[in-house]
Amino acid sequence: MEEIMIQSIDESIHCGLIKNALFLSERLYASTANEDNLFKIAQIYYQMGKINQCLLILQQHPQITMIKNLYLLALSNYDLGNIQEAESSIIKCCIYFEKYFQPNNNNNNNNNNNNNNNNNNNNNNNNNKDKCNNSNKNNDSNNNSNSNNNENEYYGIYSDILCEFDDIVDINSISYGFDSPCSIGSVYYLMGLISKRKNQKEKAIKYLKKSVYTYPFLWVAFEQLCNICPDEIDISDLFSHTNLIHQINHLNQQQHQQHQQFQQYLSNSLNQNKVNNNNNNNNNNNNNINNNNSSNKNNEQTITSTVATGTTNITTNTIKPNNFIKPPYHPNHRVGLTPSSFYDSSIHITPINFKASIQQTNQQQQQQQQQQPQQPSQQNLQKYNNRYFVTPQTPLSHITPILSNRFSQNVVDPIPMVMDTPDSKGSQHPPSSNSQTPYTPSTPGVHHHQKQQPHQHKKSAPPSQMIKKSMSNEFDTPMSLDLKSPIFTTSTSSDVHGFTSSTSKQQQQQQQTKQQTTTTTTTTTSITDKEVLLTKTKKQVNFGKTEEFSLKSLSSSLSDDDYDEENHHYQQHHHLHHHNKSIDELELEEDDQLNITDNSVQPNFYEFDESSILDFNGGDLYEGLIELHKGQTQLLELFFILADSYRLLCLYLCKEAIESFKRLSEEQYRTGWVLTKVAKAYHELIDYKEARSIFQEVSQMEPYRLEGMELYSTLLWQMNEDAELSYIAHKYSEFDRLSPYSWVVVGNCFSLQRDHEAAIKLFRRAIQLDPDMTYAYTLCGHEYLANDELELALNAFRMAIRCDPRHYNAFYGIGLIYYRQEKYNLAEYHFRKALSINESSSVLCCYLGMTLQHNPNKIQDGIDMLYRSIEIQPKNTFAKFKLAAFLFANQQYHHAIDQLLEFKEIEPKETPIYILLGKCYKQLGELDKALDSLNTALDLDPKNSNYIRSLIDKLPLEDEDDNQDYFQLN
């Protein structure tokens, strides 16, 4: 029931039925109240946007230990502004991953540490309390390097958290469902956001870098990193393919070692068991021959005794390696491929279990039998070696199967892969007591009867059908069937994987003619226990959960004491159950279970192409890994270009950023996100026409994109495009009223109409929707500045800096306030601070030069800064005019006239140009040119006619105050 409910919850979420998923998750938690099911309820509430409900659900739990619940608790607190509570939860996750997900750098050290851990377990358990009470002491006497000492000091601060982890028996179980690279990276990312909010810059940089190192595709973490320190980022280090593989292997190194150790352990077990079977082969043959004339009851006892003998050989004669570590066990762990957790989420190892592949494999087998009739089928055995570590990932393998009426009404026992039934006509070739039977590897679930010759099935199952039978058994076993025998009990290398190797008809006929004996009877435990365990396991769909091995259950099953008794009862029942059925019934059951009969109703499985099936030991897996490697390389190359371009834009190297974005392919470049960043770069370069055309293209290409439109509205405000600004304000306000970008656009529209009060209300509405929207605070500050509310403007700009320390517009706004208040030293400081962030800003250089002019000791520095502003942006008319005014004040009239004439070519209708030109010509004695310039100014600006006429009247006279009013000419 629990498996069905979990699958139903996942399907409901996938179909957008959130309320139905919430109802099912509540039923699931009522049935089984654990942290895993609690996470499902809280996660659904969080996805619905009900953060308060999510927080209360998690807080009501008496004790939260699982990492995914701690992460969701911290995320909810962060969204609600509870920064301290969020940090207390997320720090546990960070310490856990930093402490327990760091494999040693040396394999030799790993082996030595494993041996030392086995010898020091008792001492560590006895010293847990001492470690908690004495947190300042070094717990590891072997740490002699400075890095290890610093690590001990770091963990000593959080000794209480480490003590909580020490009390947990299975430390790896608390990260179940949340141990993928993306999950670990998201934990570090949230810790970086919290540190940034607390103004802990170094700590924020540390965790944001760890986030990108752990999972390079976590783009939001890289964006935050660029907002803090773009000059400290090494793109080649963060988005290197070698670094990605290193990080993935770094996270999974311990799991790989356990995997290899367990493979070696099973290999040693199989090799020694094979030797024992060879030594006892003659005795077994004699016992089997003597038992051929016995009754069915004696026959069953012989089979049972053989099973018990095989089990004893395995459990008593196998040798464990010294460095074998029993891996951590979690009841919900599933079997999966483990080259790395990243590959687990990308590759699905699928067995051949479809009709097309069965027919093709059958034809190939018949051809091989005709070409090599005498060769034993050892290749088929070798082909499927080491396949027991692969979970069948069929399209519907995670869905509880729908059984037929026969299976749903009766107690179902799994049908063996190859079942020999007694011949109704009796034995035609009685066995000879003097004949010797060659050794044959045993197969699971196969009973060769000693009383008579094995019956030849009408349809010989090829290896593909055997695989399909085993896989169908693995997923068709009812959940109510609860067998507790071990999962794997092996006697040879052929039966450990759960696959059967049958002898062809030609080989059996040759053996009947020459030797007239039956094959050796060696049986193993049924694979039913493995099927039941895999059926009962859960499949969690969480934040990037990867599938892992249930190695503890595999290793511990080899030494269970109650194995013999349970296997004895099961083999008895299993043997008698199939002896009571005819051959036709067994074939019908096999066809019904395989669903390959022509007239049967086919289940709604997805069609799989056989070319997509990956062989674990063949070339297909190698080719698949190569394709995966190519895909990762291509994705990292794309991320490298995007990251490099975005970093350049954050450094306000706009020309370089535009060229870097052009390295993208046409498909990637013609996207809304990229074009928005390119338009922003042109806007910073004061190329308003190009930026406007790009924004218009984005608005038509992706009308749903609102991010970046706030900058588009500011551009229209600067260009005084009232009609277009009103149009997009109406458009986006109707499209999404819950978006802060929509309200910023509307606010700019009212600001252009000089309705500053309405604009302030709209900007504050945007801040309510997104308290971290830096640009809304900045625009709100400018509106307060327009209303001469300087204190409110200062508060708004400071809030913007708090959200983004590199937002130079906020520093520029504070500098304007201090400049208006004639606090030139403070104004200079903030202008320089803004200029240190954006060194290519012509406006900042201009205002800094204006500020320096008021310092008598820095007048020349001010002039140089204005020249720099014009050099950065030659069309910056405001800088040209201010430079001309400075030159006029310093009696450099010819240079001032040159700047004014350049300004006149760009903006020929600006009145201040002609007024200042008239003053310059007057000082040079060229009164005719001065009169012409002043008359032109009078024609362009009749409103200031009184001031201009007074200048005309004073042309023949010397005016001592002419040098004092040039700043009024704006």
From Swiss-Prot:
<comment type="subunit">
    <text>The APC/C is composed of at least 13 subunits that stay tightly associated throughout the cell cycle: anapc1, anapc2, anapc3, anapc4, anapc5, anapc6, anapc7, anapc8, anapc10, anapc11, cdc20, cdc26 and cdh1.</text>
</comment>
<feature type="compositionally biased region" description="Polar residues">
    <location>
        <begin position="424"/>
        <end position="443"/>
    </location>
</feature>
<feature type="repeat" description="TPR 12">
    <location>
        <begin position="808"/>
        <end position="841"/>
    </location>
</feature>
<feature type="compositionally biased region" description="Low complexity">
    <location>
        <begin position="500"/>
        <end position="525"/>
    </location>
</feature>
<keyword id="KW-0539">Nucleus</keyword>
<keyword id="KW-0132">Cell division</keyword>
<dbReference type="GO" id="GO:0005737">
    <property type="term" value="C:cytoplasm"/>
</dbReference>
<dbReference type="GO" id="GO:0031145">
    <property type="term" value="P:anaphase-promoting complex-dependent catabolic process"/>
</dbReference>
<feature type="region of interest" description="Disordered">
    <location>
        <begin position="556"/>
        <end position="582"/>
    </location>
</feature>
<comment type="function">
    <text>Component of the anaphase promoting complex/cyclosome (APC/C), a cell cycle-regulated E3 ubiquitin-protein ligase complex that controls progression through mitosis and the G1 phase of the cell cycle.</text>
</comment>
<feature type="region of interest" description="Disordered">
    <location>
        <begin position="358"/>
        <end position="379"/>
    </location>
</feature>
<feature type="compositionally biased region" description="Basic residues">
    <location>
        <begin position="446"/>
        <end position="460"/>
    </location>
</feature>
<feature type="repeat" description="TPR 14">
    <location>
        <begin position="878"/>
        <end position="910"/>
    </location>
</feature>
<feature type="region of interest" description="Disordered">
    <location>
        <begin position="274"/>
        <end position="300"/>
    </location>
</feature>
<keyword id="KW-0802">TPR repeat</keyword>
<dbReference type="Pfam" id="PF00515">
    <property type="entry name" value="TPR_1"/>
</dbReference>
<feature type="compositionally biased region" description="Low complexity">
    <location>
        <begin position="359"/>
        <end position="379"/>
    </location>
</feature>
<feature type="repeat" description="TPR 13">
    <location>
        <begin position="843"/>
        <end position="876"/>
    </location>
</feature>
<feature type="repeat" description="TPR 10">
    <location>
        <begin position="740"/>
        <end position="773"/>
    </location>
</feature>
<dbReference type="Pfam" id="PF13181">
    <property type="entry name" value="TPR_8"/>
</dbReference>
<protein>
    <recommendedName>
        <fullName>Anaphase-promoting complex subunit 3</fullName>
    </recommendedName>
</protein>
<keyword id="KW-0677">Repeat</keyword>
<feature type="repeat" description="TPR 8">
    <location>
        <begin position="636"/>
        <end position="671"/>
    </location>
</feature>
<feature type="region of interest" description="Disordered">
    <location>
        <begin position="106"/>
        <end position="149"/>
    </location>
</feature>
<feature type="repeat" description="TPR 9">
    <location>
        <begin position="672"/>
        <end position="705"/>
    </location>
</feature>
<feature type="repeat" description="TPR 11">
    <location>
        <begin position="775"/>
        <end position="807"/>
    </location>
</feature>
<feature type="compositionally biased region" description="Basic residues">
    <location>
        <begin position="570"/>
        <end position="580"/>
    </location>
</feature>
<dbReference type="GO" id="GO:0016567">
    <property type="term" value="P:protein ubiquitination"/>
</dbReference>
<feature type="repeat" description="TPR 3">
    <location>
        <begin position="142"/>
        <end position="175"/>
    </location>
</feature>
<comment type="pathway">
    <text>Protein modification; protein ubiquitination.</text>
</comment>
<dbReference type="InterPro" id="IPR011990">
    <property type="entry name" value="TPR-like_helical_dom_sf"/>
</dbReference>
<dbReference type="GO" id="GO:0051301">
    <property type="term" value="P:cell division"/>
</dbReference>
<feature type="repeat" description="TPR 15">
    <location>
        <begin position="911"/>
        <end position="944"/>
    </location>
</feature>
<feature type="repeat" description="TPR 7">
    <location>
        <begin position="546"/>
        <end position="580"/>
    </location>
</feature>
<dbReference type="GO" id="GO:0005680">
    <property type="term" value="C:anaphase-promoting complex"/>
</dbReference>
<dbReference type="Pfam" id="PF12895">
    <property type="entry name" value="ANAPC3"/>
</dbReference>
<dbReference type="GO" id="GO:0007091">
    <property type="term" value="P:metaphase/anaphase transition of mitotic cell cycle"/>
</dbReference>
<keyword id="KW-0498">Mitosis</keyword>
<keyword id="KW-0131">Cell cycle</keyword>
<feature type="repeat" description="TPR 4">
    <location>
        <begin position="185"/>
        <end position="218"/>
    </location>
</feature>
<comment type="similarity">
    <text>Belongs to the APC3/CDC27 family.</text>
</comment>
<dbReference type="InterPro" id="IPR019734">
    <property type="entry name" value="TPR_rpt"/>
</dbReference>
